[in-house]
Regions:
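Short intrinsically disordered terminal tails
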Residues: 1-5, 64-68
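Acidic, low-complexity, intrinsically disordered interaction modules
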Residues: 9-66
């Protein structure tokens, strides 16, 4: 299995998020996720833009917060 086949996927009736390796995450997605996370959870969050774990964790925390 190559790296491109690995992904995290969350799905519910409101949204589907499928995020691959960091090179597969668009800068627009990162910007929007960062904006929402700062508004809803932590204004001081400044992720490493190349750390996929930062974004996966942010998605997980938002899903928990909004009970998605």
């Amino acid at each position: 299995m190559g790296n491109k086949e690995k992904f995290i996927s969350y799905e519910n009736e409101w949204m589907t998020v499928r995020v691959g390796y960091i090179r597969d995450i668009s800068m627009e997605f990162k910007d929007e996720l960062e904006r929402i996370y700062k508004e809803e959870i932590d204004i001081n969050w400044f992720p490493n833009r190349w750390c996929k774990a930062c974004y996966y964790d942010a998605i997980r925390r938002l899903i928990i917060k909004f009970d998605l």
